Design a protein with these regions (language model features):
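Extracytoplasmic small-molecule ligand-binding "clamshell" domains
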Residues: 1-102
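Hydrophobic/proline-rich hinge and linker segments of small-molecule sensing/allosteric domains
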Residues: 24-32, 114-129
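Arginine residue identity/basic-tract feature
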Residues: 66, 108, 128-129
């Protein structure tokens, strides 16, 4: 990623499993273009740690997670979870962070901490003139 855009992002991930130098990041691996599953490591995809050796994750969230891990001097492990299990995975300590296109709602902020937004989207409805 272009560091010009990410240089002012504060990376604060407390209580990561720094003892082994690994940043464990959860995502759905099913929400393209942010994250998806593929069968090869093409185009910079990374193995999905909890899916055996045959599946890989890729997408914007993977690229950003790779950047964060590299910035912290850590290796990256990506874990695939169902959407409803992502926050629980962080709370239980199974993973250190979530990178999954998750909006910071007040309800979620009661359960986990959020960084600054790294992507903003304006959704619209398109209709015939």
């Amino acid at each position: 990623p272009d560091t010009e855009y990410a240089s002012d992002l504060v990376l604060t991930i407390p209580e990561t499993d720094g003892s082994n130098g690994t940043l464990k990041v959860a995502m759905e691996c099913a929400y393209a273009p942010y994250n998806w599953t593929q069968t090869t490591d093409a185009n910079g995809a990374v193995p999905i740690a909890n899916a055996g050796s045959a599946l890989y994750a890729n997408g914007y969230d993977v690229i950003f997670a790779k950047y964060i891990a590299a910035t912290l001097g850590m290796n990256l492990e990506v874990y695939s979870y169902e959407w409803d299990s992502l926050i629980a995975a962080v709370q239980s300590g199974a993973v250190d962070a979530i990178a999954a296109g998750m909006s910071p709602t007040a309800e979620r902020a009661e359960q986990v901490d959020f960084t600054d937004c790294y992507y903003n989207s304006n959704l619209v409805i398109i209709y015939k003139k």
